[in-house]
Amino acid sequence: MTEKKRGTWASIVASRRMAVAAALGFASGLPLLLTGQVLGLWLTDAKIDIKTIALFASVGLPYTFKFAWAPLLDRYVPPFLGRRRGWMLITQIGLVGVIVAMASADPSSNTELVAYLAVAIAALSATQDVAIDAWRADVLAVEERAAGSAAYVLGYRVAMLAVGTAGLILADLTSFRVVYLGTAVLMALCIIATFLAEEPAVPEARPRTVYHAVVTPFAEFFKRLGWAALIALAFAALYKFGDQMVDGLVGTFWRRELEMSKTEIGTFNKAAGFAGVALGGILAGTLTPRLGTRRALLLFGVLQASTNFLYVALALMGKSYVLVGAAIFVDYVANTMGTAAFMAVFIAMTNKEVSATQYALLTSLSSVGKRVFGWVGGDIVAGAGWATFFGATAAMAIPGLVLVFFLPRSVIEPPVKPEAQGS
């Protein structure tokens, strides 16, 4: 494919690379709810108290600390499939095995075992994310970042919806054990995407020792960005802080506060969620290049925060099927758009030689709202109620939006090389 052809919008969207990015996004999204919303609903059905459920958000801490072992994925190249795809395959095989083991656990009689298995799923899933994120950072050209990020997020969200819709309906008809087994099968099928992905060339300057694999990514990041590195890290932590906190408890809100059945939750997610993800992915891929990254981040960020007020209305008014459908639809549209722009910025901030570690650092920080401070959400709900919780999470978006103004243009919108531009 020539650079000119690849530079045209139509050819970018229709390329095999975008299809693979979407498929790998699906692989990344599949395990997430198994340690998040679906697990929370399983614990809710097992009569586990709200504070314990909120504490279970901590099983996802590997997503927050994955930067600690990401240097190993930059340093070591598996003997098969290459530096990026090799690690994808290893983690995907591991995920299939641990998810099957999770299916045999019982949270009501052995909560501790469920927690350990959930941590294992999160660790393998986080490592898979490191490999896939590095693959995207290495493979996507500058002009492909917006579309590639949108394709990845679209696949990611579709996977989450598959688990959170069909999965919940299946749980109502059968059991959560069947849901986990079914997810393991889908995870096994995702291995096909790993074989179809192109393996990026290993840079000559990649780390040759563990020491350099650990030190170089951080030193290079701060040297290249200067003072803006601190703003970039704060932005990564705060842009989606409130949304991450909502993510950890919204399933319990539907189930316990609104007294919705698993089938109802699954049906609404299927109808409103799939439509929202599709529209959000299209809008993100189309609007981000036209608006520019900074304006896209601001617009999408405001939309993300605003959707939480629909949950405030639900908490105050009680169950309304119209409002539930509207909240889920708008939430998925806004969050898909925000996440796509967010990830495109992360790619722009990384150096391909050490992309696994640098991207992992940024995405690790982006999950602190749920993984590190998830327990705060449980305390707010227990002490002040759901309406206060959702209102507070909307306000938590403000610091991240302010930081968007301070991100240097050279960081979030690097110039496209003339020969790579489309006509």
Predicted regions, residues:
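C-terminal ends and interior cores of transmembrane alpha-helices
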Residues: M88-S108, V302-K319
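Intracellular juxtamembrane helix-capping segments at the cytosolic ends
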Residues: A126-L140, M337-N351
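C-terminal transmembrane helical hairpin of 12-TM major facilitator-type secondary transporters
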Residues: R295-F342
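Helix-to-loop junctions at the C-terminal end of transmembrane segments
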Residues: F65-G82, L279-A296, V381-A382
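Symmetry-related core transmembrane helices of the 12-TM Major Facilitator Superfamily/SLC fold
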Residues: I90-G97, V178-F195, T388-F406
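Glycine-rich segments within core transmembrane alpha-helices of 12-TM secondary carriers
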Residues: F65-K66, A146-A171, L365-G374
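Juxtamembrane intracellular "pre-TM" segments in multi-pass secondary transporters
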Residues: T2-S15, E199-I231, S423
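Short amphipathic helix-loop junctions that connect adjacent transmembrane helices
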Residues: P31, Q37-T52, Y239, G248-G266
